Amino acid sequence: MSALGRYDRHCDSINSDFGDSVRSCGPEQEELHYIPIRVLGHGAYGEATLYRRTEDDSLVVWKEVGLARLSEKERRDALNEIVILSLLQHDNIIAYYNHFLDSNTLLIELEYCNGGNLFDKIVHQKAQLFQEETVLWYLFQIVSAVSCIHKAGILHRDIKTLNIFLTKANLIKLGDYGLAKQLSSEYSMAETCVGTLYYMSPEICQGVKYSFKSDIWAVGCVLYELLTLTRTFDATNPLNLCVKIVQGNWAVGLDNTVYTQELIEVVHACLEQDPEKRPTADEILERPILSWRRRDMEEKVSMLNRSNKKPRTGTVTEAPIAVVTSRSSEVYVWGGGKTTPQKLDVFKGGWRARQVCAGDAHFAVVTVEKELYTWVNMQGGSKLHGQLGHGDRASYRQPKHVEKLQGKSVQKVSCGSDFTVCITDEGQLYSFGSDYYGCLGVNQSAGSEVLEPLLVDFFLNEPVDQVSCGDSHIMALTRSKSVYSWGCGEYGRLGLDSEDDVYSPQKVEVQRGLCIVNVCCGSDGSFLLTLTGKVLACGLNEHNKLGLNQYTAGIINHEAFQEVPYTTSLTLAKQLSFYKIRSISPGRTHTAAIDERGRLLTFGSNKCGQLGVGDYRKHLGINLLGGPLGGKQVIRVSCGDEFTTAATADNHIFAWGNGGNGRLAMTPNERPQGSDICTSWPRPIFGSLHHVTDLSCRGWHTILIVEKVLNSKTIRSNSSGLSIGTLAQSCSSGGSGSREEDSDRESLTSDPSRGFRGTIEAEPETGPFNTTENMESSSCPSWLRQELEEAEFIPMPDTPNFVSAESSQNGTTSMQDVRETPPDALEKPSFQACTCSTLQEEVRKLQDLVSTYRHEQELLCRENSRLALEVQELNGKLQSAMQMNQVVNKHGEAIHQIQKQLSLHWKSSPPSSGNPEMSREDSDAESWCFLGTEACRSSSGTPM
């Protein structure tokens, strides 16, 4: 299908969304859940709001367009952006996911770019020129995006630094397709004056037709700004600016001492006055300065986009349902002498937390914007070794952003005893803090302490998916499902079949056929979870905290107990094989696990009741918790020093074990009278109902994220009866030819930086009524006067069956002709009958036709099934016939052998007495009896 055909098809499908006033929620409709985070900005037509989509925990942007206060042209632009984006799929183009209609507000769901735009990037350079490699990296991505949209037959018409967005990994995303235009071929032209003045090509300024080469001019302007940090053309007013563009008077020259001549030639080629002499996007990519880097850059783009890439949850032909739930999100900490949960006011609103982790002496939090915050715990008193990553050893009591990771999207973080490790969206691993045991993974090449995040080069070609830290060792799971470990090797906690310390990542050999999906480190042991829910463990098994001990009881042998002190290689925890484990959390002396049914299992030491079984006795095996947790589905669990905290699906939080130093958030008044400081039964804590999204316990401390639902709203794509079907028709017709029919005007928007950054659209020709005196003297608003001036008068016949010959010839009558018509000729206006019923009848006929086709299709499917069965039956008969043929062939061969034997027998035997001829004939008849011939049958009836 051609690009134009796809454009029309998408336009019609989107129009059906807007045109239908009511549509039932069928079983095929998908329900998507969103949580608003913060407002990103305000535009001319509405707000841009950041949302978190709970299905995949991703961030998306909802672009709101208030349709009620827009002109028809502006509505068409909004619809046009959806149509264009739905056609384009490229790593350097803003991805479109969905659109919804809430009353009179159009909501467009787009990809979120957390690195701002190229305009802000240039401003923040502060006269510090970009490196040429950086410019080439940006240029390659921009031109790749332009090449994609041009191949789809789309003219962007508003390429500028404000519409070029970036991620924190410097991945370019070309956006804002509201002014984009679909052309029927590469030779088609457009003529409407649209775009931003600073980036307008000379042909647009001169009011002549333009093509895809106009976008190349804008690319040249963007490249010029990257090289000079200034506008290509600058002026105090629009007229002077257009003159400079047409004359080609650049603001400043290019410095060939900083940039190569090849790169400067690209600028000159793109800013060629003659459009025919400008290169295409593909020709720019083929230039030597980019071509020899192209493969590496394409691989880099693909790798950086891997974390952002997600399948579209719906197409424009579907009608998904959006469930928007407003939630309050808060972070609480307690322990270390603090018995009351303390709320951290830093993590709220747009800076809410998505992951938390506790270390022995510090906390770490990753926000929804994927920024890392660290600070010391409330206990304090411990010497710091740089595990906060702030470049010093200061004890920051409040959460502080790790500035050295600015520009990096931190996905996950894990804390050790005195070090911290985090991974980014690209799978890069950073470490900082103490390197005494080699936990930083750089072979102790950076010193005993690293105060700032340090990139571990080992994983540059092996992106990391998960990381977990013990007290003094680390395990990492890569995206290729390989497991690596390093650090202290005591008790074999690294799973490397030895107890040696390792200062750089070493691959852990996993049994063939096992797919590891999760790694988790305890204080001196490690766990690996497989795809089937099995558990592999290594390290110290004191108190059976790894679940490796074997305990059996029977009639003959009343008790059989096999203890495993420790293991240096990965060993299957057989006692856990009866369950399909979904998550596991090791503490210092015990471990808790959750199976696929949400049941909680505990094993290890029970000295302080941390197993939650209602007593303080020693338990040798695995304990399936009941009591207060009986029948509840546990969703989160974490183990600290001699205590356990768990959260359930019904929004309750439980804690049990050693309550000393505030570990259980239990004040003396809450403790039952006469009881000790420990509790062996899970007890609810934390007051009212809260949904826990993440939980971490370490030492005496607990940190968690809790959410409360404030309100919820369901948005259906077709919840409004607002119809803008004419907009879809105009979009579709606009893309079918080489000439645009746009005649709307858009006023020039102001530029906060003293310029003309905004987008304008103006028709070069003026209407015929600009000099009409009575129109000028009237109190009619200017916009309405303009609409009347450009309107056309369509005469309507008196009856639906009557068609004026003049109307059929002229089609429409201009307003000038109406003025010249005598008044008496206009006294009796005629009206055409409403054709809505006719259209409805046509729709019903089409629906009947579709139903007929569907019925015929079902019949064909049944017939195909029947024929398939017959073919299968015939194949079976054919196989039987072939087998019979083989049997017959074998019998024939046997008969042939018998014939040969008989022939030899008669030749070797002497002739019998009597008539020799008669004897020979009788012998022949006897021999043929083996064949069942007629001679044999006839002779058998003759008496001997």
From Swiss-Prot:
Modified residues (Phosphothreonine): 192
Co-factor(s): Mg(2+)
Chain intervals with Basic and acidic residues compositional bias: 738-748
Record: active site: 158 (proton acceptor)
Residues reported to bind ATP: 40-48, 63
GO CC list: centrosome; cytoplasm
Record's keyword terms, sorted: ATP-binding, Cell cycle, Cell division, Coiled coil, Cytoplasm, Kinase, Magnesium, Metal-binding, Mitosis, Nucleotide-binding, Phosphoprotein, Repeat, Serine/threonine-protein kinase, Transferase
Region of interest called Disordered, as start-end residue ranges on this chain: 726-782, 794-825, 906-925
Gene Ontology process terms (BP): cell division; mitotic cell cycle
The keyword Magnesium belongs to this UniProt entry's keyword annotation: yes
Compartments where found: Cytoplasm
Keyword Phosphoprotein: yes
Coiled-coil region(s): 835-890
InterPro entries: Kinase-like_dom_sf, Nek9_STKc, Prot_kinase_dom, RCC1/BLIP-II, Reg_chr_condens, Ser/Thr_kinase_AS, STK_NEK
Annotated Protein kinase domain residues: 34-290
Catalytic activity: L-seryl-[protein] + ATP = O-phospho-L-seryl-[protein] + ADP + H(+); L-threonyl-[protein] + ATP = O-phospho-L-threonyl-[protein] + ADP + H(+)
GO MF assignments: ATP binding; metal ion binding; protein kinase activator activity; protein kinase binding; protein serine kinase activity; protein serine/threonine kinase activity
Entries under Pfam families matching the protein: Pkinase, WD40_RLD
PTM entry text: Autophosphorylated on serine and threonine residues.
SS bonds (residue pairs): none
Enzyme Commission code: 2.7.11.1
Note on domains (UniProt): Dimerizes through its coiled-coil domain.
Protein name as it appears in the record: Serine/threonine-protein kinase Nek9
Organism, scientific name: Xenopus laevis (African clawed frog)
Organism ancestry: Eukaryota, Metazoa, Chordata, Craniata, Vertebrata
